[in-house]
UniProtKB/Swiss-Prot annotation:
This is Inner membrane protein CbrB. The lineage of its organism: Bacteria, Pseudomonadati, Pseudomonadota, Gammaproteobacteria, Enterobacterales. It is a multi-pass membrane protein. The chain crosses the membrane at residues 12-32, 37-57, 82-102, 114-134. Residues 1-11, 58-81, 135-155 are cytoplasmic. The keyword S-adenosyl-L-methionine does not apply. Keywords: Cell inner membrane, Cell membrane, Membrane, Transmembrane, Transmembrane helix. Residues 33-36, 103-113 are periplasmic. Its main location: membrane. Disruption of this gene leads to hypersensibility to nitrofurazone. It is found in: Cell inner membrane.
Amino acid sequence: MSVSRRVIHHGLYFAVLGPLIGVLFLVLYIFFAKEPLVLWVIIHPIFLLLSITTGAIPALLTGVMVACLPEKIGSQKRYRCLAGGIGGVVITEIYCAVIVHIKGMASSELFENILSGDSLVVRIIPALLAGVVMSRIITRLPGLDISCPETDSLS
């Protein structure tokens, strides 16, 4: 498979599925945390939409990063997952820092609350989980034909 096709494949799959994995964790965290954020989710259903749109660009960039990993790292599941998780966290933090400094994009109070330093766990853990899970399953998704047997097995 050509590098450009792998970059497009990884980037799009990460951008579409990655934020959904993060939102799943976020909903579970809010449900079990018994914090006032539960009221925000009930009152503002746009919370999930903001979470997905906030995570789509970092997920796309993480997918491109995972696609561009050298063959030695990309062909081993552990290293690919480690790189995907760390890359997801770093790219998400850089992206959120840029958005907070632009202030024009962070106009709503809820959006600023999500991106503030007080809710670090709301950004880091979903990005880490999405990066690791997507790096793990990316070779099993349709459209990618890798002949490396170690990469194709889920064990």
